[in-house]
Amino acid sequence: MIFKAAGSGAEDRPWRPWDADGLPLRDSLRGLSPYGAPQLDVPVRLNTNENPHPPSVGLVDAIGKAAALAATEANRYPDRDAEALRADLAYYLTPDAGFGVHTSQVWAANGSNEILQQLLQAFGGPGRVALGFEPSYSMHRLIALATATEWVAGQRAEDFTLSPAVVTDAIARHRPALVFLCSPNNPTGTALPPEVVAAACEAVEATGSGMVVVDEAYAEFRRAGVPSTLTLLPRHPRLVVTRTMSKAFALAGARVGYLAAHPAVVDSLYLVRLPYHLSSFTQAVARTALAHADELLGTVEAVKAQRDRIVRELPALGLRLAPSDANFVFFGRFADQRAVWQSLLDAGVLVRDVGLTGWLRVTAGLPNEVDAFLGALGRTLTGSVIGADGVISLATA
């Protein structure tokens, strides 16, 4: 890997090419690839699970006014503990939790990835193990490795489900400092049954060590009747539930993540957070969005409608899919998912190849974007052959 200076005229500057092997990079980081979905300029981008609905003109105006007000004191450091924002988040979480969430139980940071990083800084590190069950959100593994925490990957069943027995057996075997679960799971999209999370909590409580972290980034999109893991917090002090404002709140550009947990967990994060880590502007934007929660969350039902439309139509093309409680659908199985991905891209539709053989993931976009996806996929699969094992092979030219 060769590094070159970036920016205007960089190619004319006398920078000596430098091989990264010459840098004192930690051995545990060598050979790794950075996280990132392709950022391509195509008409239809359905690969990063963004909410396709931009903020309204009224909300844009409100955010602008809040940012302008924050700018009047930009010479001062922000509220170091983001007390007002955390109080607003606690109020927002209370209905899902089924109990009165208190400010002391909530923490906020720059996106849920910083939340995950702080948890690993506080409870992981050298000589400690983090356990996850793959396929799942790849940043759990990457942040674990970045914090010198050993990563152990447990495996899901062939249909991507996870049973209490599998989870408890893995915890007993590896005695992890942190157990990462996704509900809904990314990339498969299905929420975990509460008994799986409860079993994980009981297992770490039995060992006397470890935390259970449930990543609920897509919780607002879950199907009717599916409870949030927040309801388990009063009974399990070692449980942490993380969320984000990037998805349901359509604030991916603001980078706001948060968690709910026992106050002692929040107190622990004060030890690893950077000073004034959440800017005045970020706090102002997030609080404004929460004040307009009804408007923003009104887009959730529209997104779910397009998700459910995809779920209804894909089986008619011979495809299998995982039940979705998120704003995306995981579908397959293909003999060559990369060829399908490329065919869709050639048609101007970008979906996500997460690297799992035979499967792709598509975000539920606007109606016209879903039209484009379904049309392109139908054309791609024209003449394809479904084998006895259910695997789809594209027609040869």
UniProtKB/Swiss-Prot annotation:
The modification N6-(pyridoxal phosphate)lysine is found at K247. Its cofactor is pyridoxal 5'-phosphate. It holds the Pfam family Aminotran_1_2. GO terms for biological process: L-histidine biosynthetic process. Gene3D superfamilies: Aspartate Aminotransferase, domain 1, Type I PLP-dependent aspartate aminotransferase-like (Major domain). One of its GO terms (molecular function) is pyridoxal phosphate binding. Pathway: Amino-acid biosynthesis; L-histidine biosynthesis; L-histidine from 5-phospho-alpha-D-ribose 1-diphosphate: step 7/9. It catalyses: L-histidinol phosphate + 2-oxoglutarate = 3-(imidazol-4-yl)-2-oxopropyl phosphate + L-glutamate. Transmembrane segments: none annotated. Its EC number is 2.6.1.9. InterPro entries: Aminotrans_II_pyridoxalP_BS, Aminotransferase_I/II_large, HisP_aminotrans, PyrdxlP-dep_Trfase, PyrdxlP-dep_Trfase_major, PyrdxlP-dep_Trfase_small. PANTHER family: HISTIDINOL-PHOSPHATE AMINOTRANSFERASE (PTHR42885:SF2), HISTIDINOL-PHOSPHATE AMINOTRANSFERASE-RELATED (PTHR42885). Belongs to the class-II pyridoxal-phosphate-dependent aminotransferase family. Histidinol-phosphate aminotransferase subfamily. Homodimer. This is Histidinol-phosphate aminotransferase. It comes from Frankia casuarinae (strain DSM 45818 / CECT 9043 / HFP020203 / CcI3). The gene is hisC.
